[in-house]
Amino acid sequence: MLGQLQDAGNTTTISNYLNLLDECGLLASLSKYAGDEARTRASVPKFQVYNSALMNAYNPLRFKAARTDTKEWGRLFESAVGAHLVNGADKGNYEVFYWREGNEEVDYIIKKDGKLVAIEVKSGRRSTNSGLSRFRETF
């Protein structure tokens, strides 16, 4: 991540801005779950809004149009689940991560008391969970 931030400008400034957005309850920065602290810290973050209404306020699609667009609806649904998870992390005393390896991913990884729960969000009936299988094999 630092390499990407250096290309964008001062890493300390960007890091401070991201921290301020997190402290204000606007944007959480989820680390990639990697199994060890060094690889987790070096990962590119996945950004998650604390309130999905902020995302929807700037969405040009109205509810009915978004609901019929399966890709857009899936994105909104995943964001709503993520918002719920990051908002509950402090009270639930857990950490929220994501995981991705190549084309396989798991939307959210919950870590509490050394135990992991992998969550793949699907808004429709069709489901491919190769990411869950790969995550289970790896960790």
List each model region and its residues.
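Catalytic cores of nucleic-acid endonucleases
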Residues: 123-139
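Active-site ExK catalytic segment of metal-dependent nucleases
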Residues: 114-126
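Accessory nucleic acid-recognition modules appended to NTPase machines
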Residues: 1-116
